[in-house]
């Protein structure tokens, strides 16, 4: 087409065949039992008179994807995303604090709805939300910072994940999700961090939110370095975007 932004090449759509299934121990569940557990957990979240709002939820997504292409590809992927979410909001006068726990970024089964674990977690959420009401304010000064793994996950997601989305770098999503400070000429050259920084993209790791056997164009999942010894190697995107 005279209006195409890039010429098509068959190499960006390799033939693929196979099956991928999310790992899980338990898939079936009783809706009544699950509802009872959420109601019970909500009562535990409201275990202090200073708790003004409590929320308990369950997220269950069971998805089947069938991919057939004229290049001979024929593959099937079955994804099961399961996870609970709990939140308590505490108030004392004009001071309001909240504490939460969400475990929804994973592929697993109904085994995550373990009552003993959930009740203990909700007790902690309630207790910590109330404790925050009387906690001292974080001091305003320059200091060394040690990040917990949960916060480090978010830091990597925002500072590296979004910034290296190839569709952002190419400008395809500029009006929708924004662009990136990374330029095409930065690949193989940009010093992203110290020599100790090594970051990989690996969808073959089990139980992760982004685990899969094949991407949306049928490309087989594999472990790839995106930053090696501090230097940017590649972006995040399908073969067609990478070719551009």
PLM regions: where:
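C-terminal, non-catalytic macromolecule-binding modules
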Residues: 229-244
């Amino acid at each position: 087409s005279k209006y195409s932004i890039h010429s098509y090449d068959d190499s960006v759509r390799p033939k693929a065949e196979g099956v991928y299934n999310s790992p899980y121990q338990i898939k079936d569940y009783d809706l009544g039992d699950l509802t009872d557990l959420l109601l019970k957990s909500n009562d535990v979240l409201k275990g202090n008179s200073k708790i003004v709002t409590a929320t308990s939820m369950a997220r269950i997504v069971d998805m089947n994807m069938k991919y057939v292409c004229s290049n001979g590809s024929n593959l099937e992927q079955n994804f099961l995303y399961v996870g609970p979410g709990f939140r308590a909001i505490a108030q004392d006068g004009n001071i309001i604090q909240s504490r939460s726990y969400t475990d929804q970024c994973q592929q697993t089964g109904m085994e995550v709805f373990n009552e003993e674990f959930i009740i203990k977690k909700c007790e902690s959420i309630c207790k910590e939300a109330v404790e925050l009401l009387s906690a001292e304010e974080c001091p305003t000064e320059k200091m060394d910072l040690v990040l917990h793994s949960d916060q480090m996950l978010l830091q990597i997601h925002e500072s590296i994940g979004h910034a290296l989305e190839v569709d952002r770098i190419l400008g395809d999503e500029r009006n929708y999700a924004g662009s990136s400070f990374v330029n095409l000429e930065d690949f193989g050259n940009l010093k992203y961090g110290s020599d100790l920084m090594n970051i990989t993209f690996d969808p073959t790791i089990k139980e992760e939110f982004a685990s899969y056997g094949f991407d949306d164009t049928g490309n087989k999942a594999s472990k790839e370095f995106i930053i090696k010894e501090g230097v940017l190697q590649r972006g995040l995107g399908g073969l067609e975007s990478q070719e551009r």
